[in-house]
Amino acid sequence: MKKRIFAAFAACALLLSGCAGGQTAEDTAQDTDAANGELRELTVVLDWYPNALHAFLYQAEQAGYFAEEGLTVNIQSPAGVNDAMSMVAAGKADIGLYYQQDVIQARVEQDVPVKSIAAVVQAPLNIVLSLKEKDITEPADLVGKTIGYAGTELSEALIHSIMKESGQDPSSVEMIDVGFDLMSSMVTGNVDATIGCLVNHEVPQMEKEGFEVNYFFPDDFGVPQYYEGIFLANDDMIENEPEVLAGFLRGCQKGFEDFKNDTDAVLQVLLDNQDESNFPLDPDVEKQSCQTLLPLMETADAAFLSQSEACWQENIDWMYEEGLISTKPDISEVMATIDF
C-alpha cells in the first residue's frame, strides 16, 4: 500500500502561502461558465494510484452522472503522498480522497483548513498481516515478534493500543521500519508480521502469488472503528459551494449503485483508466478487491458516503489518548455535513 505518514505539513504551508484572499481569475471564469450553462470543472486528487476503491468515480464520470449535476470531474493520481490534502487545502484541487486520522492531526497540529465531507469506506482496511506459518492470529501472538511498518506514528499507536488492550506489554514487540517494502519484508523473513497492508490489496496479491496468510484488524482489539477513506474539501468551498459538493456526492452515489449492481462492468471501466505505465493493475487482484470492498463501503448500519459524529469523536479521543494529537478538536472542525 502507499506509505501513510503523519507529516509536518510543509507542503500545505507552502501552497497556502501562495493563495491570496478573495476570488481568483479561475474562480471568475468558472462562475462565468456556470452562468452560461457550461460544466463546472472539479479536480479530485486520489489517495493512491487508481484501483478498485476508485472504480465508482470513473464509472460516475463515464456514465455522465457528474455531467447530470453540471460537473466534469478530472480525477488525478497524487504526485506526492500528501497531495490529496495539501492541494485541496491550498485551493489547487477541489476534493481529495484521504484518511480520517490524518485530517484530525492536520487540523489540530497545523490548522490545515480541510474537513471531511463523506466517508468512502465505512470500516478499516488496514490489517496486521503475516504468513500463515507464523501462526499469528491475535495480538498475544505478537509477543517477542518483529513487525514491519512504514515508519508512521499511526502504525506505532495501533500496535501499542492493541497490545495494551490484550493485556500484553507493548515493548515486547520490536517495530522495524521497512519503508514501502511491507510484503517483501514478510516473504523474505526479515519480519514476522506487518501493519499497514490492506485487506483488499496485499491479501489478494499475496494469495495469487501462492502465499497463505493470516491477518486481523486492529479495531477488533480496542482500536475504534474508523473510516479508511474520506472525501475532503477546504473550508472555503464547504462554505461557499455546498451545492457543488452535493452534486459531486450524488454522482458518486450513482456510480456506486452501478458498482454494486454490475461490478464486472464497472471494474472494466477502472481497468480502462488504469495508470498502466506506472501502476498496472492485475484484473484478478482487483476483482477480489471489489468483493472485499463492497460490503465495507456500505453496511447494514451505514449508507455509502455517510459519516457519524460518534465515529469522529471516538477517533479523536483515541488519538489524544495515544499522544497523536495535543488537543481534542470540536467535531465541527474536522467534519462537515453536506446534504445530498
Model regions and ranges:
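Short linear loop/turn motifs
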Residues: 74, 82, 220, 284-291, ...
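Short, low-complexity disordered leader/linker segments with a strong preference
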Residues: 1-40, 340
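Conserved C-terminal helix/tail region of periplasmic/extracytoplasmic solute-binding proteins
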Residues: 310-340
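Short, glycine-/small- and polar/acidic-enriched structural segments
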Residues: 30-177, 185-188, 192-200, 216
